[in-house]
A protein has these predicted regions:
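N-terminal secretory signal peptides that target proteins for export/translocation
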Residues: 1-4
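Bacterial N-terminal signal peptides
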Residues: 8-19
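Solvent-exposed helix-loop boundary motif
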Residues: 24-116, 133-160, 167-234, 264, ...
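Periplasmic/extracellular electron-transfer cofactor-ligation site
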Residues: 39-62, 124-134, 389-404, 544-545, ...
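Catalytic cores of secreted or luminal carbohydrate-active enzymes
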Residues: 109-128, 632-639, 643, 647-648
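Mature extracytoplasmic enzyme cores
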Residues: 119, 163-167, 247
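Primarily short, surface-exposed interaction patches in extracytoplasmic proteins
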Residues: 229-303, 314-588, 623-624, 644-703, ...
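Long, His/Glu/Asp-enriched segments that create or flank divalent metal/ion-associated functional microenvironments
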Residues: 581, 589, 597-598, 602, ...
């Protein structure tokens, strides 16, 4: 049989296998049994025969995305030398996996193993590709699917496969397991979960035949059940969080003090520190509603639009190298204006998706120029607006999600009509024609359809992007609102309900599903109003909690029982240094007086911003912005000539303080208000006065030293 003669010959070979009698045993075929087994043994992993060039002359498709090709490689390539139909036990396949002959992957299936027996039975049965009449797999489930577990507990999982004829089968031994957080729980190849010593919620994924299922473990804090205090609810967020904390045997920290809240909310909403005067005004205010009033005021400041335009410019890839200087600036101005006017987020998404016409008049269309091709566009839209990563599915079945190659290319199809042409008004974006998308492996035509939907028989009429935009912004869309509120929650609370924030999938469940659903419903109810959602989140008691832990939540970094420490973003920290020293930073290509948060151009060269993790906007992944602390950052803050120059600047704040205040206590207090938005404690005041007093003949230099020490403190570098 010659495969090269056509698909019909291959199909005939696939249907009948080799011309051997089928033994009277339980049916075994390639698609339902051998493919899962090879995946289970790691044969088609990217580190083995699934790598691009294969391994030792034998190549399988990674994660079995091309079963027909894998069948051909195993049974027909190299003159069929891997299978011996007349002497099944002598097949090279069996001799390799059992260790009878040398195998780079080692012994994968000893002769007395269940895996070896299954391979042997398949060969004896004639190596059928499929057995006619066998039911198809519809879903898998894990037993148990959810459980409360103690520290160091073990739980065996069972994977049950459900088929089209309503039968089910235990396929645990053919399944692949993966833990989302190995610090909280590990899982072995047999599906036995071992809980660690961390409090919270975690999940373990099982995969079989492209289907996935999850097991969720809730791990409460050990010890006697705590008496949960009666706490006031600021809004719907708090009782949902409290209910979760009760299950975990955790008591939340108390509310933060006014100074902590003041600094936190300025940094989170406006991306800057409050001035000393702003701090004094707020701290001296005794009215009961001053916190919500401050939030309302900050949302109407120009700094709000500056900071949130920076965040969206990262996501939407405002990149001068990609777009050119003028076009990148137009794109940024459109984003900034949209946020300044509080454009509903569904409108913003729709305008980006359906932009058409001259780009000078429709700057939202630059979103399309930020992508390299239609596949890149599909991946960008999915990740930015749905929080779904589909890039893996370009080449193969997503290993941790349900997305297939067909799903990926169906999303591509929505953008296949989009072209650019020169017009009287400059470069214009058009959506025209009815181009087709073909499956790269099978050649079958794929009609565009959104993620999770079914493929229609005919392509959408007109501009296909409107179909996608309507689906995406529909109130019942399972991704759009959840993705947006998860990103907002991560910004304000330091961690998403789903982590990473742009990786929403069935196998990566939220730490508090009820809260994510409630936040998403609130966003939809409030017509996707960004400012309203910010008010809701910042008004909650949960957001306003202190970062100081108690005995029950000392190790909690997942369940929002206390505020988390967050290193300031690069631009915000640079501006904070400028605010404390009173000396602006000079950035190349922009007038003096520009704050780092206002920089629309991510390609402006600046050592500090690069060191502290400013993204280059090469991708839409939140992970491109580095928020962790490093030794290099600490050394730079301590030794930077630029910072030393700002401290000693003749027009800077340090010189003004020494000239305007004869009382050293006033200077110490002003520095603390500027850096920390609070007055110094008694001990801090005494330490500051003692230091300044000991250097009275070098008073200005001593004030510089004190300011330097504050800017190098944990309290300055982090939001808390």
């Amino acid at each position: 049989m010659i495969i090269a003669r056509g698909a019909g010959v291959l199909l005939a070979m696939i249907c009948i296998g080799f011309a051997l009698p089928v033994h009277a045993t339980s049916p075994v075929d390639f698609t339902n049994d051998i493919i899962p087994l090879m995946s289970r043994l790691g044969c088609n992993a990217s580190a083995c025969h699934g790598k691009a060039e294969g391994q030792n002359g034998f190549k399988l498709s990674v994660f079995a995305h091309d079963p027909v090709g894998d069948f051909r490689a195993l049974t027909r390539e190299s003159r069929g030398r891997r299978i011996s139909p007349t002497a099944p036990a002598d097949s090279l396949l069996l001799r390799k996996i059992s260790g009878a002959v040398g195998h780079g992957g080692g012994v994968r299936a000893p002769r007395n193993s269940r895996a070896y027996s299954l391979f042997l039975q398949w060969i004896k049965n004639g190596t059928p590709y499929e057995i006619g009449g066998r039911p198809t797999l519809t879903r898998i489930r894990l037993e148990p699917s959810r459980q409360t577990a103690a520290f160091n507990a073990s739980q065996p999982l069972k994977v049950m496969a459900e088929f089209s004829d309503n039968t089910h089968r235990d396929v645990t031994w053919l399944s692949i397991f993966h833990s989302n957080d190995t610090g909280m729980a590990t899982v072995d190849e047999k599906g036995i979960v071992t809980i660690g010593n961390s409090v919270g919620q975690t999940s373990v994924m099982a995969r079989y035949q492209g289907k996935v299922a999850t097991f969720q473990a809730i791990v409460p804090r050990p010890g006697p059940k705590v008496t949960y205090p009666h706490l006031p609810n600021h809004n719907f967020i708090d009782p949902i969080v409290d209910s979760h904390l009760k299950r975990l045997n955790i008591i939340p920290s108390p509310l933060s003090d006014d100074a902590t809240f003041l600094r936190r909310v300025y940094l989170d909403i406006a991306g800057r520190l409050p001035t000393a005067n702003e701090s004094e005004t707020f701290l001296s205010d005794s009215t009961s509603g001053k916190r919500s009033g401050l939030v309302d005021a900050l949302l109407e400041t120009p700094e709000f639009a500056d900071y949130w335009a920076l965040k969206w410019a990262d996501l939407l890839r405002v990149d001068r190298l990609k777009l050119g200087h003028e076009d990148a600036h137009r794109y940024y101005k459109w984003i900034h204006e949209s946020l300044s006017k509080n454009k509903p987020l569904d409108h913003l998404a729709r305008e980006l998706l359906t932009a058409e016409g001259p780009l000078t008049e429709q700057p939202a269309g630059f979103f399309y120029r930020a992508a390299n091709n239609t596949g890149d566009m599909a991946a960008m839209v999915s990740q930015v607006f749905l929080g779904v990563r589909i890039t893996c599915a370009e080449c193969h079945q997503h290993p941790y999600d349900r997305w297939t190659q067909q799903d990926y290319h169906a999303m591509r199809g929505f953008f296949q009509q989009v072209t650019t042409k020169n017009s009287a008004g400059g470069l214009a974006l058009l959506a025209e024609g009815n181009p087709t998308i073909k499956h790269p492996r099978t050649g079958a035509i794929i009609q565009p359809y959104p993620l999770g939907e079914s493929m229609p028989e005919e392509p959408p009429q007109g501009d296909r992007r409107h179909v996608l935009a309507n689906w995406m912004t529909h109130p019942e869309n399972p991704y759009f609102a959840r993705n947006l509120v998860n990103r907002l929650w991560a910004h304000f609370l330091g961690k998403g309900l789903i982590t990473p924030v742009d990786d929403l999938r069935e196998t990566n469940p939220p730490s508090n599903p009820e809260l994510l659903d409630a936040l998403a419903a609130s966003l939809v109810k409030n017509n996707y109003d960004l400012k309203k959602m910010i008010r809701i989140i910042t008004h909650s008691r949960t957001y306003q909690l202190s970062s100081k832990p108690n005995a029950t939540n000392l190790s909690d970094e997942q369940n929002f029982s206390r505020a988390l420490f967050r290193r300031l973003p690069a631009e915000v920290l640079m501006d904070a240094v400028c605010d404390v020293t009173g000396v602006d930073e000079k950035f190349d290509g922009v007038p003096r007086g520009y704050r780092a948060v206002q920089l629309w151009d991510s390609q402006v060269q600046h050592y500090f911003l690069k060191l502290f993790g400013r993204p280059a906007r090469a991708t839409v992944c939140e992970c491109e912005r580095v928020t962790g602390a490093s030794m290099g950052q600490a050394l730079h803050l301590m030794n930077s000539p630029n910072i030393q120059t700002k401290l000693a600047h003749e027009g800077g704040r340090i010189k003004r303080l020494t000239l305007e205040h004869e009382d050293d206590a006033d200077i110490v207090r002003q520095l603390y208000l500027s850096a920390f938005s609070r007055s110094p404690s008694r001990d801090e005041m005494n330490t500051g006065l003692q230091y300044l007093g000991s250097r009275r003949f070098q008073r200005r230099k001593a004030v510089e030293d004190l300011a330097w020490s504050l800017m190098n403190s944990f309290e300055f570098i982090f939001n808390h």
